[in-house]
């Protein structure tokens, strides 16, 4: 997660997503992770790719404008997802068929992890992002953690 902290200095809006995003919401690591998923302002796609390649990452999968997966022997896998950000707080991501996924403002938030405030996909957003496909074992695990986060938030609000 050290790279996530460094990305905060890029002046680029981003959110931690995927399994690490779930664990950050929960406040601790609950499983092993193959990669780190970052959703970010699509206006910075070239700049982010240049930075990652300068740090030793090589492109493994290029499905732009939807996503790019990169790998570094020293740093592992990172999966970046360009989002078009709108002034009203909504956003969208290109899908593989030429359409768009549309996202509401409350899908984005922050959580404290290891004493730092980390921009991440909210529990509500994680539920949506974990739908529309056949769930793998790790997705089922992540959804159970998300449900625990939502239950804890509901108890705290009351």
Go through each PLM region and give its residues:
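Short, small-residue-biased leader/transition segments that mark boundaries at the very start
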Residues: 1-5
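Conserved catalytic core of two-metal-ion nucleotidyltransferases
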Residues: 57-91
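Catalytic cores of NTP-dependent nucleotidyl/adenyl transfer enzymes across multiple folds
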Residues: 93-158
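Short amphipathic alpha-helices in soluble, non-transmembrane regions
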Residues: 48-54
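Active-site nucleotide-donor binding segment shared across nucleotidyl transfer reactions
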Residues: 6-36, 41-42, 47, 122
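Short, solvent-exposed loop/turn segments at secondary-structure junctions
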Residues: 21-22, 85-87, 125-127
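Anion (oxyanion) recognition and catalysis
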Residues: 8, 53, 112
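Structured helix-beta-strand junction loops
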Residues: 10, 54-55, 149
